[in-house]
Amino acid sequence: TLNGTPIHVSDKPLDQGLFIMGTAIYLREFVKPTMSLTEQLLERSCDYRRFGAATLDLCYIACGRAEVFFEYSLAPWDYAAGAFIAQEAGAIASTLTGEPLPWIRRCSVWLANPANQHVLGELTV
């Protein structure tokens, strides 16, 4: 809940909504793939946001404030709580290769409302 009101992901398609991205800038090998994926998502969305704290980003998806989140490399302490909250609110979580989140190791993270889970399969990751 948020201030006593149950939260839920939005039902907006990405072309009417936002995506949130993380940069993993400390891992230089992910700079170009991150920018490529950002460009692909910008072509399919209204805009994007970059807040800098993955758990906050994932909770924004849970509350319906944005439709999709991705980052190429997050440690479990960066994504586990937020991904769990978002899944409880109706989000679908996976790695960028479509695998289930491992919960115990570093991985890429894709989180989307059900209306946008298909977008992952349309992207060059």
Predicted features by range, described:
Residues 36-42, 56-125:
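Oxyanion/phosphate-interacting regions
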